Swiss-Prot record:
Residues 1-178 are annotated as: Apo-citrate lyase phosphoribosyl-dephospho-CoA transferase. One of its GO terms (biological process) is prosthetic group biosynthetic process. It comes from the Bacteria. The keyword Nucleotide-binding applies. It comes from Weissella paramesenteroides. Gene3D superfamilies: Triphosphoribosyl-dephospho-CoA protein. InterPro entries: CitG, CitX, TriPribosyl-deP-CoA_syn_CitG. Its EC number is 2.7.7.61, 2.4.2.52. This is Protein CitXG. Keywords: ATP-binding, Multifunctional enzyme, Nucleotide-binding, Nucleotidyltransferase, Plasmid, Transferase. It is an enzyme of class 2 (transferase). In the N-terminal section; belongs to the CitX family. Pfam families: CitG, CitX. One of its GO terms (molecular function) is ATP binding.
Length: 462
């Protein structure tokens, strides 16, 4: 079913009349609220169907998300579902006009259905009233269909209405789908996508303190070529992980994990042989191996939901914290030391809980992103870094207090527009230099990004 199967068609004259009505109301609000900023919002929907129950819900959900970022004592008036041309809303707020415009643009570009919104920000008497997207560090608004500047496509009439409807329907279905589905795939498909996760991560630039194509980051014993060698050396391990999951017949999935872990020990040695004893992917061997095995097991008889895969993972690693961390043995790894010192469970805690940092944070965030592959992955990495108790970061900082700093750094990054603005990217380069100076690294976040890329590739999010 299409969003546009229901609703009353409107003609061009009705649309033009509504434009005049909106302009008069905006002017009135600017006069009666001369010391405030006026924001108006509507949906940018092509064709004659501009209002129905689904479009109203899209608008209300997005509008509520948008206004939640402003002071709760702001006055606002809403006109919703009354006009045949679609729902509209108006709000007056205090603040700096340029900052509010940036907030509106970021909403349009980062909210799952934000690109369907048209938000105008205006005020009397502020010098930056005429600031454009480009003046604020953003690129031009892009066409939903082809990604070229929207003004060019509109002027040249490059696309049909049916093409526009198809893309909007796909966006809506993607944003409202309740859960990711893993289809039954071949060993080659699953393993190749796992390798993509490893290779895409190291190819991404810039990343705070991490190895990338132009920098060793804070890892002076590593470079990108070493990561490529390491990634390729793990193909045999990933093949075995898939076979273990697809062929396992028992009911005690802890036995499946034990078999995987034995292969993981061998894979670590293979990695060290490929990297001259540098630890490039020890964390990924653990986490990526678990996911490959769990997906292969869960989909042996057909498709599986994210929830089903997570339950398999939890059954595989049941009792892992007690076995690895709660014993009285001498701590030999950063994760074990941090559990004994700070009671942080690290990657084992993530695994025991079914990797909530992946399935509840990183993947949903990735699903809502847009732009180039680099932009989407950089923003996703920083979202991960904002929420993860990164054992690599804690180890290098020698204190978990660095996690609060990380939250602040990522908050500044996103307030500046993230990967979609020059200011955001400059900040990320500056942050990379700061990490190198302080010998910090978000290695745990990188491992989580690898998993997210793998899942994104396998399910069609990327």
């Amino acid at each position: 079913m299409s969003i546009f199967d229901i609703g009353e068609a409107v003609d061009l004259l009705t649309v033009l009349d509504n434009r005049e009505w909106r302009s008069r109301l905006q002017d009135k609000l600017k006069v009666t609220n001369s010391d405030k900023i006026v924001i108006s919002a509507k949906l940018n929907i092509p064709g004659p169907i501009k209002n129905n129950d689904i479009l109203q819900k899209i608008f209300m959900d997005g509008w509520q998300t948008f206004v939640a970022g402003f002071e709760c004592n702001s006055q606002y008036e809403m006109l919703f579902a009354e006009r045949a041309t679609g729902p509209e809303a108006f709000i007056t707020v205090d603040g700096n006009l340029a900052a509010v415009k940036k907030t509106a643009i970021l909403f349009e570009e980062t909210y799952a259905l934000g690109r369907l919104f048209d938000i105008d920000v205006m005020a009397n008497g502020q010098a930056d009233y005429q600031l454009s997207r480009e003046d604020l560090g953003f690129g031009p608004r892009l066409c939903l269909i082809c990604g070229k500047p929207a003004k060019v496509c509109a002027k040249e009439q490059n696309h049909t209405l049916d093409e526009g409807y198809e893309v909007i329907n796909q966006m809506y279905q993607g944003a409202t789908s309740k859960e990711l589905i893993f289809e039954k795939e071949s060993q080659e498909t699953v393993v190749n996508n796992a390798l993509k996760g490893l290779l895409y991560e190291v190819s991404l630039n810039p990343k705070p303190g991490l190895v990338d194509p132009v920098s060793m980051g804070s890892h002076t014993d590593m470079n990108m070529f070493m990561f490529i060698d390491s990634s390729l050396s793990l193909k045999s391990y990933l093949d075995k992980a898939f076979k273990l999951g697809r062929n396992f017949e028992g009911s005690d999935l802890k036995l499946l994990f034990n078999a995987l872990r034995a292969e993981g020990v061998l894979a670590e040695q293979t990695m060290f042989n490929a990297t001259n004893n540098a630890n490039t992917h020890k964390g990924a061997i653990f986490s990526l191996g678990i996911w490959v095995t769990a997906i292969a097991y869960s989909t042996k008889d057909g498709s599986a939901t994210m929830t089903e895969v997570r339950r398999v993972i939890q059954r595989m690693v049941e009792g892992l914290i007690e076995k690895d961390l709660a014993s009285n043995r001498v701590a030999t790894t950063a994760g074990e030391q941090q559990f004994q010192t700070y009671q942080l469970t690290g990657i084992r805690g993530e695994a025991v809980n079914g990797f909530p940092g992946v399935s509840e944070v990183a993947v949903p965030f990735l699903q809502a992103t847009f732009g180039t592959m680099t932009q989407r992955l950089l923003d996703t990495l920083m979202k991960i870094a904002a929420t993860l108790e990164d054992s690599t970061l804690i180890k290098r900082a020698k204190t978990p207090d660095v996690l609060a700093e990380m939250k602040e750094w990522t908050s500044i990054y996103f307030k500046l527009g993230g990967s979609h603005t020059e200011q955001g990217m400059k900040y990320l380069y500056d942050l990379d230099r700061l990490f190198i100076e302080r010998n910090l690294s978000i290695g745990g976040s990188a491992d989580t990004l690898i998993l997210t890329i793998f899942i994104g590739q396998l399910t069609g999010l990327l």
